[in-house]
Structures are given as structure tokens and as C-alpha cells.
């Protein structure tokens, strides 16, 4: 939407309010944004601009449009300039206050307000959420409430952070808004601390550092406004206060690297200050330095910072009270005493992991912050402490601490004497940090003193003497002290003892201040034994023969003088030779240097000549190029001027300009801008002339109207007088007519009243009668209504009882259905379990039967093998005998036949061999003679004139089996061996299609037809029907079939 139609800013504001009222905040925001960007309304600030800006910021906050808000603030800064700084400050404060209120409201509504790990939700407010984070949030275990809180709170946190950044960038070069800039920086620090935004705090520190570096460079805006002057004392004080606040919040957020950088900036500000900072400023500076050094475990620099602070407090006692001085003195004492004797791992490893060069550079930087040239030692700090007379100002409870640690030799009572001091330190929060390092120092002093009294000591007693530390801490300190060569001892855990090493060959301890000594150790005395002996012998000789000693001394002195003179002359000769060589080298070097200088000078001259020639050529080319460009620019300007002349000639003012111009000056003296300017001036001139003409016409008309009015005044007065007289006459006549009419009406009413008085009793009686009837009807209706209400109440109560009874019945039926369903489910599960159990039992039975069949098959095969062996034996016995036929077929005798002997006749039911003479045949029916079956049972003779039917097997035990392999049916039909009985005891007959059970029938009860029908037919025989087939398992995957015809089917 174009803003050209808004000639006044208040119209745009009203339009935006109307759009917001109808639910179109986006259009309202665009309206105000276009107005702020319009150059037409940036010339002069008005109060309406402030209202527009506040409404604009409200819309940006409603829509969470931080970039638009930032751009609007920049445009408003241009509008305000230097004349309305208070308005800009008011708008900025309103913007930040509203954003902070929104965040606080979202924080209160969010259920994450009790958590301090908001940083775990979104690590960086400036980074967009990645697809991986979106997917992870979708599948995370957070509930809907946590996700809703995150969505509700985090956008406002991001918006507030963007607001802080925008305001700081806006005010960084505004000298009149410097106090607002630093106030905003402190607000941003509180925001980072309140919501645990560590990443944003680091960005804030980088931003403030960048702005400070930019202030060191002179800056001037496009409008001519000067930037912030870093040399201004007020600016320095603002910056120092902001940095000190930054260091405090950095400590709370554990951002000590940022605190150290801020401290370096503070050092630079103090050094560059034109005026000397006040003593309280130095006190704050040294106190912050001491905190940083303690956190970085630079205990020596920490103590040095407290020394500097105490010195500042003493030299400026008027600026500090007595409690501050006492606190500083106590801190100096504790910091100096707790400086480690060595870099024990359990105490401090400040330089671990640093290269020597880096370590030296770091120490130099830290010393520079305190104005020192190097890192002070522990002894120097203690000596400086006495130079400052610190012990006079320390707390009374700490006055004996120095003597306890450095002077007294009482190892057995050291723990008891140190206990009150340690308790005092623990009870005061400002001194509690010194408890642990002080324990380490006390333990080392205790062990040093014990090493002078004992060569070995029980660990239990040692731990008891060091009761201010746990045994584990004591042992850890011992190990690291031996590792760093502070102590000479060893721990024997097997015997639970501590051995102090007094061996003369042991390593030398570090040269540290050992504190009080009772006597030197044996190792120390042995190390200096020869020196002591020499000194004492010299003293004895001097006492016995002083003259000899003096002569000896004089001789020694003369020899020493001669040696010194010889050495001096030798050195002089060597130096003279070296001097000659040095002079030769200097002469040679001077000659070479002069030659090189001449060559360099010649080369430089040539280079200068070439450079001058190149510059001249380049200058000529540039001049030609400049002239060419000038001609091109003039031609372009001339074309633009002609186009502008054509544009403006369409108006009357433009035509006047065209007539007044000299076209030869186009493009040189007169440009297109000049033409437009002249046309604009001519338009303004014409407009002024029109205004003058209009004003003259207005003046003429005013005079004419005034003259007319003056001539009309007398006539208007006469007309008014005549109208007044006529109106009075009309009023009198109307009043008289109204009164006469009222008198007549009153008389008529009185007559009517007298006439109606006779009807008054009848009227009263009629009213009473109607009233009684209406009352009676009302009472009847009331009784009827009460009766109907009572009946309805009874009916409702009855319906309620029925409803409750129906609900109860439905509940009981539902409960019965549920119980019945549960019972049916239980029975169904029992039936299924029973069927499963029966199926398992059936499987077990079938498995057992299969195993029995396999065993029977195996036994049958063994018996068949035995039968074959016996057949072979009988065959060998009968091979020499001559066979005689015993029976033949009666019809045909073409081929000789032989009858089987009685001893080898085969039963048609089973394959048992029987003797006709000695045994009856219970399974064979009694017959008069042998039945011709068409085949021979003799295995020794010919088969007769009729070929036996090929059934795929042989029934003779002596002949060949034919051209087909016998079919294994699980039984033997040979008459020479025993038969393996089949086991049918375990089979049942559930249906006609299953196997039949023969276990209930005896062999004698079977008919001959049944016995003959149990043979196994060949593959070419007719297949038996399904009901008469008996299947049995002979092995894995095998099957045999036996046709069992009915009793009437025996025809063969």
C-alpha cells in the first residue's frame, strides 16, 4: 500500500489503528513501516512520530517481527537526530520494557520456570532449528506440556535477545545516549544470567569488546554527529562500571575466560584514562583480579592482587572504612600463606599443558595486569606482607596463624591449634575458600616437623595428628609431595607405617621454605660433612700456629697475585690478537658495505628514472582519459538537459523556463537538475502570483459584502419592529380564544358529571360482582394447578424410581453377562487346553507305536536272516537226494511236476513250516483232496504244463524268486522258518477308514477265506477298496496294504 495519500503522520496512525481493530495487524505494520521509511516525513520530528513508533513496536511485538522493529528504530533515530534524544530514549526503554514483560509472562506461564536448564532446550537463540532437532523433539520422551512450554517460551527469549542486540547496535555511536547504551548492556547481562544463556553472554562480551575497539577510532555520522569519545572521563567511568558488572555476571555464569578478557579491557581503560582513577575504582579492580586469579589457580598472583588492594586501602584510608581494611589485611595473610610450596596435583597445576614459551608469555600477561615484571615467589609475598605491616590490621582470630605455620615447632599440637582457625574460616563465607589450601600447607609443615623427630611413624598416628584432613586426602598429598621432591618419605601399607628417608644418597629436596627447624636431618649433615671438617680444621690451625698460618696466607696471596697477572697478560695478548682480527674484519665489512651502498644507490637512481618515466606516461594517459570522460559526461549532461527541457515544456511554467534559457549552455553551465530546479522555482513563482491574485479578489469581495451589510441594517430594523407588533396582536387574539373554549368545556363537563351520579350504585355492584367471579375462577385455577403439580411430582418420582430400578437391572444383567462370558472363556480355554493335551498324548502314542513297529521290523528282519540261513543249510543237505513228485495237476501233465514234501508245505495263512504227520493244521479246512490253484509249491521240480502266476514273490523256500524283487510286507511266507508275530494290541479303530483291530480274534476262529485273503497281492492285482485296506508303518516313509475281503468273497 502506497503512503503518498497520507499527507500527515497522524492519518497513517489512525489508518493503522483502524486496520488493527478489524484484525489486520500485518497491513497496519506495513502502513507504519512505509511511513517511517518515507523520506517525506523524516525532515522534522513531531510528537506524533513518537506515538507512531510506539504503535509500530507494539505491532512488531504482537507479530514477533524483530527485523522490522530494528529497522524502524534506525529510521526513528534518523527522524529524532540530535533534537529529540529524550524521545528516542523513551521509545527504546518502552521497547525493552515491553519485551521483558512478555518474556516474564511467558516464563510464569511455562512449567519450565522451576528448571534452571533452559540452555538444554535451545543451546543457541541465533541458530535456526535443524531438521534433526525437529525430528528428535518429535520422538523424544517430552510430554505435550514440555513441548508446548518450549514453543511458548523460546520465541520470546529469542525476540528479547534480538531486541538487546538491536538497541546496542543502534546506540553504539550516539554520544548523547551513552548512559542508555550502558544501561541496556547491563540489562542484557541480567537477561543472560536469569535465563542461563551462556552462548548469548559470550556474544554479548564480543559485541561490547568490538564496540570499545570502534570507539578508539574517531567516528562521525552522515549527519555530522560526533561519535563517542573514549578519552572522555565520563565515558571511561561508564565503560569501567559496565566491565565490572560484566565480570560479576561472568563469575556467576562460570565464564572466566570472558571475565579475564574484560579485565584486560579494564586495564587498558585505566592506563588510557587522562585523569587518575579514584581509590575505590582501584579497590574494585584489584578485588576482581583476585577473584579471577583464584579461579584460574594462580595463587601467587592472587596474593599479589590482595597486596595491591591492601596497599591502596592503606594509602587512601579516607576512602575505606576500618572493616574493609581489616578484611583486606586478613585476605592478604591467608592468600600469602596458602601460596603452594610446590605445584602439587591436589592443590594446583596452573601451568600444566603449556609450552615454556606460552607459560612465560602467560605469566608476563598476568604480571602486567598487576604492574609487576614477573610472578612473585612465596617468600617475597611474605616479606612484602611484613613491609606493609599487615599483621597490625588482621582479624584477631588470625593473628597467630602466621606463627603457627611459619615459626612454631610443635607438630604434636599443630592440629589442635589449627582447629579454631579453620572453624573461623568456615564460618565466614568470604574466607571459606582458603580452608582447603591452608590444610595442605599445614599438612606439609606437619610432615616436615615430624621428619625431624622420627625416622618412621605409624600411619594411624600420622592421620591422627593430621585430624583436620581425611586419611585419603593425607595420602594423596603425601604421594604428590614425594613426586615433586618436597618430602623424602615412603609409605609401607603392609606394616601400616610411614618412613622418613634420611639416607645420605637420597635425592635433594627442593629449595623451599621449610618453616621452623629443630635440627638438620642426618642426610643434610652428611651432605655438608667435608665442608664442616675443612672449616673446623682451619679454625684449629689458626688457633695453634697463627704465624705459620699468616706466612702461608702471604705465600698463597703472592702466588694468587702471580697467577692473576699471568692470566691477565695472557688475556691481554689474546684480546690484542682478537682486536687485530676484528679490525681487519671491520675494514673488509666497511668496504663491502660501501660497495653495496653504491650499487644500491645506482639501482635506486635507475628505478627512480624508470618510475618517473612511467608516471609521466601514466599521467598523460590519465589526462587523455579524463578529457575523454569529460567530453562524454558533457554530452550525457547535454542529452539529459534536453530531455529535462522537453519534460518541463509541457507546463506553462516550463515554457517560460524554455524561453528564458540559452540552449548553447546546455550540458556545460546548465544541467538537468538546474532545469528541473528552475521549473520548480517558476512553478512556485506562479503559485505565489496566483495566491496574490486570490488574496486581492478575496479582499475586494470582503469590501463589497461589508458595504451591502451596512446598507441593509436600517431596513432590517424596520422589518423587525413591524413583525413584533403583528406578532403581539396575533398572541392576544389566540389567548382570548383559548380561554373562552376552556370555559365552555368546563361547563359541559360539570353537566355530564351531574348526569352520571345516578349510575354510581349500579357501577359499584357490577364491579363487586365481576371481582367475585374473577376471584372464584382464580381460586379454581389455582387448586387445579396445585393438583396438577402434585400429580406431576408423583409421576416424576415414580419415573425416577423406575429409572433407578431399570439401571440396577441393566447393571445386574451386564454383570451376569460378564460372569457368563468369563465362564465361557474359561471353559473354552480349558477345552482348548484339553484338546492340546490330547493331541500331545496322541502324538506320544503314535511315536511309541512307530518305535514298536521299528523294533518289530528289526526283529522280523533278523528272523528272516535266520530263516535264510536255515534254508541254505537244508538246501545243502537235500542237494544230493533225488526228488520224486508227490502230486500234480490232474488236467495237464505236459511238464513234469514235483510235489513239495510234507515237511515243507506252506500254510496259506502264515509262513510257519509244519509237518503233516506229526502236527494238525488248525487253520486249514478239511478237504478230500488237494485243490488245484494253478501253481506249484515245489521248489525242486518243474512247474508243470501251466505256468504259475507271477505275483512278484516266491512261496518256495528252495527255488529262485523270479524276475521281480520280492515286496517287503513285514512278514515271511516261507515255510522253512518261524514267523514273527505281529503286534496289534496297541491299535484302535476310531473309524472304518482306519486300521482294523485283530487283537480280539484268535487264529483258530478265522475262516479259510479270511486266511487266504490276507496275502499281499502283486503290483498288477486289483486295488482293494478303501474300507478294506489296512495300512501300517514298516519304517520311515514306508506303507503296505493288505486286502481284507468279507467272509462271503472267498471263491478261490
From Swiss-Prot:
One of its GO terms (biological process) is translation reinitiation. Residues 568-712, 769-882 form a coiled coil. Keywords: Coiled coil, Cytoplasm, Initiation factor, Protein biosynthesis, RNA-binding. Residues 325-505 form the PCI domain. One of its GO terms (cellular component) is eukaryotic 43S preinitiation complex. Its main location: cytoplasm. PROSITE patterns: PCI (PS50250). Pfam families: eIF3a_PCI_TPR-like, PCI. Belongs to the eIF-3 subunit A family. RNA-binding component of the eukaryotic translation initiation factor 3 (eIF-3) complex, which is involved in protein synthesis of a specialized repertoire of mRNAs and, together with other initiation factors, stimulates binding of mRNA and methionyl-tRNAi to the 40S ribosome. The eIF-3 complex specifically targets and initiates translation of a subset of mRNAs involved in cell proliferation. Component of the eukaryotic translation initiation factor 3 (eIF-3) complex. This is Eukaryotic translation initiation factor 3 subunit A. It comes from Monosiga brevicollis (Choanoflagellate). The lineage of its organism: Eukaryota, Choanoflagellata, Craspedida, Salpingoecidae, Monosiga.
Amino acid at each position: 500500500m502506497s503512503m503518498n495519500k497520507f499527507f500527515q503522520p497522524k492519518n497513517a496512525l489512525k489508518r493503522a489503528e483502524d486496520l488493527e481493530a478489524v484484525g489486520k495487524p500485518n497491513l497496519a505494520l506495513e502502513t507504519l513501516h512505509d511511513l517511517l521509511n518515507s523520506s517525506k516525513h523524516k525532515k522534522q520530528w513531531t510528537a506524533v512520530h513518537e506515538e507512531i513508533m510506539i504503535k509500530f513496536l507494539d505491532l512488531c511485538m504482537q507479530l514477533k517481527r524483530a527485523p522490522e522493529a530494528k529497522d524502524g528504530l534506525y529510521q526513528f533515530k534518523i527522524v529524532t537526530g540530535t533534537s529529540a534524544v529524550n524521545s528516542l530514549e523513551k521509545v527504546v526503554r518502552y521497547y525493552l520494557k515491553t519485551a521483558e514483560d512478555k518474556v516474564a509472562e511467558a516464563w510464569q506461564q511455562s512449567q519450565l520456570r522451576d528448571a534452571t536448564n533452559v540452555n538444554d532446550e535451545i543451546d543457541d537463540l541465533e541458530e535456526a532449528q535443524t531438521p534433526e532437532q525437529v525430528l528428535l523433539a518429535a520422538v523424544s520422551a517430552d510430554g505435550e506440556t514440555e513441548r508446548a512450554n518450549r514453543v511458548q517460551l523460546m520465541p520470546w527469549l529469542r525476540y528479547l535477545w534480538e531486541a538487546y542486540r538491536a538497541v546496542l547496535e543502534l546506540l553504539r555511536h550516539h554520544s548523547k545516549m551513552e548512559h542508555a547504551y550502558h544501561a541496556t548492556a547491563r540489562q542484557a547481562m541480567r537477561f543472560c544470567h536469569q535465563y542461563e544463556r551462556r552462548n548469548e553472554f559470550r556474544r554479548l562480551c564480543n559485541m561490547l569488546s568490538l564496540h570499545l575497539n570502534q570507539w578508539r577510532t574517531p567516528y562521525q555520522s552522515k549527519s555530522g554527529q560526533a561519535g563517542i569519545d573514549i578519552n572522555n572521563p565520563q565515558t571511561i567511568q561508564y565503560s569501567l562500571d559496565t566491565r565490572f558488572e560484566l565480570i560479576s555476571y561472568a563469575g556467576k555464569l562460570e565464564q572466566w575466560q570472558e571475565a579475564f578478557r574484560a579485565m584486560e579491557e579494564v586495564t587498558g581503560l585505566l592506563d588510557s584514562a587522562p585523569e587518575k582513577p579514584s581509590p575505590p575504582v582501584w579497590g574494585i579492580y584489584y578485588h576482581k583480579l583476585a577473584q579471577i586469579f583464584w579461579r584460574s589457580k594462580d595463587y601467587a598472583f592472587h596474593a599479589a592482587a590482595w597486596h595491591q588492594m591492601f596497599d591502596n586501602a592503606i594509602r587512601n584510608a579516607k576512602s575505606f572504612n576500618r572493616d574493609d581494611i581489616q578484611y583486606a589485611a586478613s585476605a592478604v595473610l591467608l592468600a600469602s600463606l596458602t601460596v603452594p610450596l610446590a605445584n602439587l596435583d591436589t592443590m594446583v597445576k596452573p601451568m600444566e599443558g603449556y609450552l615454556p614459551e606460552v607459560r612465560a608469555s602467560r605469566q608476563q600477561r598476568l604480571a602486567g595486569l598487576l604492574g609487576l615484571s614477573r610472578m612473585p615467589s612465596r617468600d617475597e609475598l611474605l616479606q612484602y606482607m611484613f613491609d606493609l605491616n599487615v599483621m597490625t590490621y588482621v582479624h584477631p582470630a588470625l593473628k597467630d596463624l602466621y606463627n603457627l605455620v611459619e615459626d612454631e615447632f610443635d607438630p604434636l599440637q599443630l592440629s589442635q591449634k589449627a582447629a579454631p582457625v579453620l572453624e573461623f574460616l568456615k564460618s565466614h563465607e568470604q574466607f571459606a575458600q582458603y580452608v582447603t589450601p591452608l590444610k595442605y600447607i599445614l599438612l606439609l609443615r606437619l610432615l616436615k616437623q615430624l621428619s625431624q623427630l622420627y625416622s618412621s611413624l605409624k600411619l594411624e598416628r600420622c592421620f591422627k595428628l593430621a585430624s583436620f584432613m581425611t586419611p585419603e586426602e593425607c595420602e594423596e598429598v603425601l604421594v604428590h609431595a614425594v613426586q615433586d621432591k618436597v618430602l623424602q618419605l615412603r609409605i609401607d601399607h603392609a606394616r601400616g607405617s610411614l618412613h622418613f628417608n634420611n639416607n645420605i644418597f637420597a635425592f635433594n629436596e627442593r629449595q623451599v621454605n621449610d618453616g621452623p627447624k629443630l635440627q638438620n636431618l642426618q642426610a643434610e649433615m652428611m651432605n655438608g660433612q667435608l665442608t664442616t671438617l675443612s672449616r673446623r680444621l682451619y679454625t684449629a690451625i689458626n688457633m695453634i700456629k697463627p704465624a705459620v698460618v699468616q706466612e702461608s696466607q702471604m705465600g698463597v696471596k703472592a702466588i694468587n697475585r702471580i697467577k692473576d697477572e699471568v692470566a691477565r697478560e695472557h688475556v691481554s695478548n689474546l684480546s690484542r690478537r682478537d682486536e687485530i682480527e676484528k679490525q681487519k674484519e671491520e675494514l673488509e665489512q666497511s668496504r663491502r658495505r660501501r660497495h653495496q651502498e653504491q650499487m644500491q644507490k645506482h639501482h635506486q637512481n635507475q628505478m627512480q628514472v624508470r618510475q618517473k618515466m612511467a608516471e609521466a606516461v601514466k599521467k598523460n594517459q590519465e589526462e587523455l582519459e579524463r578529457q575523454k570522460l569529460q567530453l562524454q559526461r558533457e554530452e550525457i549532461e547535454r542529452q539529459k538537459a534536453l530531455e529535462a527541457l522537453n519534460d518541463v515544456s509541457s507546463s506553462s511554467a516550463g515554457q517560460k523556463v524554455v524561453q528564458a534559457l540559452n540552449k548553447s549552455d546546455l550540458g556545460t553551465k546548465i544541467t538537468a537538475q538546474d532545469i528541473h530546479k528552475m521549473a520548480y522555482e517558476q512553478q512556485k513563482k506562479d503559485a505565489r502570483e496566483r495566491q496574490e491574485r486570490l488574496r486581492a479578489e478575496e479582499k475586494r469581495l470582503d469590501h463589497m459584502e461589508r458595504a451591502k451589510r451596512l446598507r441593509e441594517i436600517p431596513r432590517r430594523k424596520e422589518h423587525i419592529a413591524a413583525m413584533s407588533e403583528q406578532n403581539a396582536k396575533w398572541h392576544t387574539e389566540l389567548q382570548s380564544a383559548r380561554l373562552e373554549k376552556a370555559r365552555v368545556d368546563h361547563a359541559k363537563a360539570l353537566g355530564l358529571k351531574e348526569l352520571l351520579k345516578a349510575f354510581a350504585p349500579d357501577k359499584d355492584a357490577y364491579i363487586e360482582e365481576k371481582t367475585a367471579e374473577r376471584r372464584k375462577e382464580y381460586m379454581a385455577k389455582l387448586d387445579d394447578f396445585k393438583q396438577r403439580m402434585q400429580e406431576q411430582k408423583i409421576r416424576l418420582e415414580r419415573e425416577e424410581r423406575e429409572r433407578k430400578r431399570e439401571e440396577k437391572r441393566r447393571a445386574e444383567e451386564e454383570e451376569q453377562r460378564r460372569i457368563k462370558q468369563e465362564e465361557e472363556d474359561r471353559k473354552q480355554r480349558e477345552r482348548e487346553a484339553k484338546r492340546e493335551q490330547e493331541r500331545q498324548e496322541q502324538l506320544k502314542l503314535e511315536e511309541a507305536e512307530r518305535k514298536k513297529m521299528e523294533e518289530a521290523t528289526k526283529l522280523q528282519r533278523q528272523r528272516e536272516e535266520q530263516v535264510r540261513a536255515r534254508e541254505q543249510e537244508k538246501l545243502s543237505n537235500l542237494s544230493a537226494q533225488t526228488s520224486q513228485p508227490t502230486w500234480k495237476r490232474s488236467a495237464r501233465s505236459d511238464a513234469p511236476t514235483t510235489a513239495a514234501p510234507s515237511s515243507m508245505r506252506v500254510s496259506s495263512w502264515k509262513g510257519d513250516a509244519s509237518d503233516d504227520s506229526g502236527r494238525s493244521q488248525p487253520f486249514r479246512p478239511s478237504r478230500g483232496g488237494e485243490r488245484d490253484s494253478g501253481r506249484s509249491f515245489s521248489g525242486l521240480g518243474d512247474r508243470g504244463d501251466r505256468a504259475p502266476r507271477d505275483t512278484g514273490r516266491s512261496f518256495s523256500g528252495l527255488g529262485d524268486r523270479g524276475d521281480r524283487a520280492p515286496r517287503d510286507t513285514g512278514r515271511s511266507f516261507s515255510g522253512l522258518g518261524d514267523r514273527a508275530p505281529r503286534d496289534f494290541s496297541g491299535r484302535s479303530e476310531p473309524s472304518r477308514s482306519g486300521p482294523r483291530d485283530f487283537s480280539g480274534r484268535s487264529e483258530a476262529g478265522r475262516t479259510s477265506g479270511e486266511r487266504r485273503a490276507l496275502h499281499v497281492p502283486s503290483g498288477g492285482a486289483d486295488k482293494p477298496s478303501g474300507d478294506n485296506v489296512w495300512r501300517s508303518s514298516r519304517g520311515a516313509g514306508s506303507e503296505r496294504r493288505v486286502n481284507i475281503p468279507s467272509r462271503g468273497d472267498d471263491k478261490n
